[in-house]
Curated annotation (Swiss-Prot):
Gene3D superfamilies: Alpha-tocopherol transfer, CRAL-TRIO lipid binding domain, N-terminal domain of phosphatidylinositol transfer protein sec14p. Pfam families: CRAL_TRIO, CRAL_TRIO_N. GO terms for biological process: lysosome organization. The keyword Iron-sulfur does not apply. Keywords: Cytoplasmic vesicle, Endosome, Golgi apparatus, Lipid-binding, Membrane. This is Clavesin-1. GO terms for molecular function: phosphatidylinositol-3,5-bisphosphate binding. PANTHER family: ALPHA-TOCOPHEROL TRANSFER PROTEIN-RELATED, CLAVESIN-1. It is found in: Golgi apparatus, trans-Golgi network membrane; Early endosome membrane; Cytoplasmic vesicle, Clathrin-coated vesicle. Required for normal morphology of late endosomes and/or lysosomes in neurons. Binds phosphatidylinositol 3,5-bisphosphate (PtdIns(3,5)P2). It comes from Pongo abelii.
Length: 354
């Protein structure tokens, strides 16, 4: 899979002028189970798919302040799926998607995998992406927070790498319907590292992921979070939608509660799963292709050991061997701890994504 970049602006808005048979190609490749799930959970109806898409497209004229750089059927469809085919909500998300990019132009300049900042973040494992999906068909993303080397990667570049990864993944219509899971392992994440997570950059991430991207997140799982991450979470809660807050789960070092929501057979051994330890270079190799092996010397003796030699266009430097920190989670008896004390600990919100 090659690097992804923002598409050039369309000269003219697309209009639908085909028949139903032409439109149903948008569901091509979906399993019968996923098509039925889209019908039941997302209100997706192939008989009126063209009408739903066109209704969203017709709203573009109401926001002349925004440059809608892409308006084809497949692109608009992912926003409809993200908002359960409520056309007004889908258009609002579409507008926020492009407005976020207008307001943060520097973030999306050279927005592709071989951009030096994005490339470094990908090589350092931001994000990790598991090859297989969970039992609900959701893609699992991993963030090992302690591996953030602040001398190598800015928070913004890590965010750019995550957004670019989501752009690549969301091309899969199965994931548009089934969604994503994010697991953040805070093992060995120091107070000094946490001090760099200012409210302004956290707000930037929330706006980019929660408010401006057409992905369905079924859950955000914190593992091994220290007390100061709880404090940071308190700071960002006002920026989170109620739906988002209900889907954030704080597991501490008790993996049994995580396994209640994500079965161990879909998790690497770092999280008490039955899969092998996660290879931090897997996703970077997928996005960078030949560029990965040409410019970087990776030696994986295990998840713990990663040696990186990086050469940039402006500066040659050799990084000292970097120890990738392992999760300190344990599997022990316990129950799920939701972020809201006293709140019903029903897992249903994770099954019926909004």
């Amino acid at each position: 899979m090659g690097p992804v970049s923002l598409l050039p602006k369309y000269q003219k808005l697309n209009t639908w002028n085909g028949d139903l048979a032409k439109m149903t190609h948008l569901q091509a490749g979906l399993s019968p189970e996923t098509i039925e799930k889209a019908r039941l959970e997302l209100n997706e109806n192939p008989d009126i798919l063209h009408q739903d898409i066109q209704q969203v497209r017709d709203m573009i004229i109401t926001r002349p302040d925004i440059g809608f750089l892409r308006t084809d059927d497949a692109f608009i469809l992912r926003f409809l799926r993200a908002r359960k085919f409520h056309q007004a909500d889908a258009f609002r998300l579409l507008a926020q998607y492009f407005q976020y990019r207008q307001l943060n132009l520097d973030m999306f300049k050279n927005f592709k995998a071989d951009d030096p900042g994005i490339k470094r973040a990908l090589i350092d494992g931001f994000p990790g992406v598991l090859e297989n999906r969970d039992h609900y068909g959701r893609k699992i993303l991993l963030l090992f927070a302690a591996n953030w080397d602040q001398s190598r990667n800015s928070f913004t570049d890590i965010l750019r790498a995550i957004l670019l990864s989501l752009e690549v993944l969301i091309e899969d219509p199965e994931l548009q319907i089934n969604g994503f899971i994010l697991i953040i392992d805070w093992s060995n994440f120091s107070f000094k590292q946490a001090s760099k997570l200012t409210p302004s950059i956290l707000k930037l991430a929330i706006e980019g992921l929660q408010d401006s991207f057409p992905a369905r997140f079924g859950g955000v799982h914190f593992v091994n979070q220290p007390w100061y991450i709880h404090a940071l979470y308190t700071l960002i809660k006002p920026f989170l939608k109620d739906k988002t807050r209900k889907r954030i789960f704080l597991h501490g070092n008790n993996l049994n509660s995580l396994h209640q929501l994500i079965h161990p057979e879909f998790l690497p051994s770092e999280f008490g799963g039955t899969l092998p330890p996660y290879d931090m270079g897997t996703w970077a190799r997928t996005l960078l292709g030949p560029d990965y092996s040409d410019e970087n010397d990776y030696t994986h003796t295990s998840y713990n050991a990663m040696h990186v030699k990086h050469t940039s266009s402006n500066l040659e430097r050799e990084c000292s061997p970097k120890l990738m920190k392992r999760s300190q989670s344990v599997v022990e008896a316990g129950t799920l701890k939701h972020e809201e004390k006293g709140e019903n600990e029903n897992t249903q919100p994770l099954l019926a994504l909004d």
